[in-house]
Amino acid sequence: MMIFEKKPILYSLFVFTGSTIGITAKILQSIKSYGTSFKHPFMYSFILFSSETTGILTYKYCFQKEDEESLPKEESITKMKAQIHILTIPAVFDLFSSFFGMLSYENLPASITTMFDGGNTICVFLLSLFFLKNTHSKNNFIGVFLLIIGLFFISLSAIKDKNNSVDEESENKSGFVQTIVGIFCCIFCNIFTALHAITEEYIFKTRIIHPIKLIGFEGLFGTIFSFVFILFFSHIKFSRSIDFLCIKDKETGNVYIENFYIAIKQIIEEKQILFLLVLLFFLFIIYNYCYITITKVTNATTNIVLYNLTALFIWIFFLIPIHKQENQERIGILQCIGFLILILGVCVYNDVFTKNANLDESEIKNLITETSQITDDSLVI
C-alpha cells in the first residue's frame, strides 16, 4: 500500500480510474440486449457498493491490528461502536448521487456530464461554508463564480446539441426535454455528491476511523440499500411518456426505472455486458481507495477538483470517430468556452496563480536570513 502514499501516483490513479469508469459506463448504456439498452442506475450503484464492501476484508487483514494498537483499547472499542451506524448517512447520499449520475449519463453526452461535476465544487464550497464553518478566501468566492459561468455555457452547449443525445428509444420525445432532464439529474448528483463528501470529511474530523474501514462499512450499507431499491423498482411500472429514462420489457411492453429480471436476461444474452460490469467492479475498488485517501490527507474539495480533470480525457476519447452515433461527440464552441472557464475557475479557487508568489512570514524571515548569509560570505571572499 506504500504506492498510495505518494501523492502524484495517488492523484494519477484517481484521474485514470475515474475517466475509465465514465467511458465504460457510457459504452455499457449503449449496448442493446433483450430489445433495450442496458440502463440500470441502481444496478451500477450495487456494483459500486459491492466493490466498496471488499474494504472490510482489506481492513481486517491489513490494517485492523495496527489501527487498534494506536489507541487505548477501551477508547478503540467505544469509537468502533460509535462509527458503524453513522456510516449509513454517507452511504445514502452516495446511493442517490450514483443514481442521478447514471441518469445524467443516459441523457447527456459523457463529456458534458463529467464537466458538470464542476458543480460539486460549488456545492462542497457552500456546504463547508455553512455546516463545517470552514473559512474561505476571496479567490474561493471568485473561483466559484467562474465555475457557475462555465457551467452555464456547458448547459447552453448541451441544449444546443440536444439532437445528438436522442436515441432510437426516445424518438417520440423531444431532445430538449431529455437534455433538460439530464441537466437536472446532474444538479441533483452534484448536491448528493457534495453531501457525501462533506459528511465523510466531518466524520474524519470528529471520529477516529481508518479510511479503508469507512469504505468497507459504507459499502456494506450501500449494497443493502441499493439491492432493496432494485427489487422495489423492479415491480413499479412507469408511464411510457418518460421511456427515455426507462428500460422496456420487450415481452410485456412495460417500462421501468430499474428491473433486476431484465438486467439478468440482458447479461445472459450479451456477454460483453458481464465483462464490462466486472471491469467496473475492479475499477471502483481502486477509485474508491484513492477517493477516500485523498479526502483523508487533504479535503473534500481537492477530491472533487481532481475528478473534474477526468472530463478532458473522456471528451478526447469520445471525439475519436470510432463510436456509435449516440456516443459520438464533437468539438462545440460553447462547450470549449465553458470548459476553459471551468479550468480557470478551478485554478483561481485553488490559488494556482498566487500560491507560489505569496510567502508567509516564516518564509520571508528564512529568505532574509539566507540573503544575509550570502552577503556575509561574499564580503569574506
Q: Across the structure, where does each feature detected by a protein language model lie?
A:
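Polytopic endomembrane small-metabolite transporters, centered on the Drug/Metabolite Transporter
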Residues: 1-381
